[in-house]
């Protein structure tokens, strides 16, 4: 994506590899974001009011309890080149405005989310992960899904023989 892109959602069904891809992105981009890349698992969160505290904790903010957290968080993140990787946000999509508030309050922050559902925010760029195609007759040895299956089957049993009737 372009340098101006600030919010990317890796979208796909459960188990497709969204979190794995996010982990690879983390490893690759650590040097690009001089103030840090923070992987923040959000699967356990169920309430909107848990979003800002989870991000504050992950990024090292020690909030002043008598002051509202959002302005403290935006001040803490503001001006820093940070990538927030927010993993498993699908149960929080109704509260996507919290993510927009972070982007608005901390203009140099970038966010990558993983989700089964879109956030439906205006500037969201969606990167969809889909499964491999399966041939209708199941006999296409050149098909990616069949080739992957055969590779693992042969790894498990090197003596396995495969023919067109298998």
Language-model features, listed with the residues they occupy:
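Short, polar loop motifs at secondary-structure junctions
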Residues: 113-119
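Active-site-proximal flexible loops/turns
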Residues: 48, 94-95, 122, 138
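Short amphipathic alpha-helical segments
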Residues: 96-100, 124-127
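Helix-loop-helix "sensor" segment of P-loop NTPases
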Residues: 61-67, 119-166
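Walker A/P-loop phosphate-binding element recognition
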Residues: 1-93, 100, 104-113, 131-132, ...
């Amino acid at each position: 994506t372009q340098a101006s892109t600030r919010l990317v959602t890796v979208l796909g069904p459960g188990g497709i590899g969204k979190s794995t891809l996010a982990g690879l992105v983390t490893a690759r981009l650590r040097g690009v974001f001089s103030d840090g890349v923070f992987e923040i698992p959000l699967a356990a969160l169920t309430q909107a009011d848990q979003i800002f505290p989870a991000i504050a904790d992950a990024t090292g903010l020690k909030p002043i309890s008598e002051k509202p957290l959002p302005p403290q968080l935006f001040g803490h993140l503001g001006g820093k080149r940070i990538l927030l990787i927010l993993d498993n946000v699908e149960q929080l999509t109704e509260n996507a405005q919290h993510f927009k508030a972070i982007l608005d309050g901390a203009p140099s922050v970038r966010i990558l989310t993983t989700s089964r559902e879109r956030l439906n925010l205006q500037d969201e760029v969606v990167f969809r992960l889909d499964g491999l195609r399966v041939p209708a007759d199941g006999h296409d040895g050149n098909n990616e899904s069949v080739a992957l299956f055969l590779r693992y089957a042969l790894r498990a049993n090197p003596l396995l023989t495969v023919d067109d009737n298998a």
